[in-house]
Amino acid sequence: GTGILSFELAKWPGELIAIEPNDEMRGKAVDTLKGLSNCKVLNATAEKTTLSNNSVDLIICAQSFHWFNPGKAKIEFQRILKKNKKVAIIWNIRSAETDFEKAYEDFILKYAIDYIEVKRREFRGNNLDQFFKSDSYEEKMFIYDTYLTFQQLLGRTLSYSYMPNLDHPILPAM
């Protein structure tokens, strides 16, 4: 992704390796993580990370699992994880209950490039039983409110993979 979560995780001790196959998203991540000596960003995929066997303490997939080939990603995760280490699969699920949230969802539906496809993939990705199969997993949900300035909301909106790029002709209409 764009490195938003990676920036926060980089505050933890240890090395952080971000995997991003998309050139534009990876470029944003490199900019976001610039100057952080414990971070590196790789041009790779969840299914082929290029990392060494048994080299990773924790894998965190934030807003990305729906892009993976689950079977191949699981094999890769098992290869790179150290023994008895963990995988965290994270989604931010946006509420659409208030008038503002409903209007924002309508805005996204109007201007997004492939939002319906991404939402369909996210739903499929939520079936963690298939990914973990006989391995045990724990599901936790945390409810939280986020208060954003207009600039923060704009930045978040433009960071979604399904929203137009900054050079897209529809951007001025947004």
Where do the PLM segments sit?
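Class I SAM-dependent methyltransferase SAM/SAH-binding core
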Residues: T2-T49
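C-terminal helical/coil "lid" or tail adjacent to the Rossmann-like core of SAM-dependent
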Residues: Y137, M141-M174
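A short acidic, Gly/Pro-enriched loop at the edge of an enzyme's catalytic core
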Residues: E47-I59
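Conserved catalytic/acceptor-binding region of the Class I
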Residues: Q78-T146
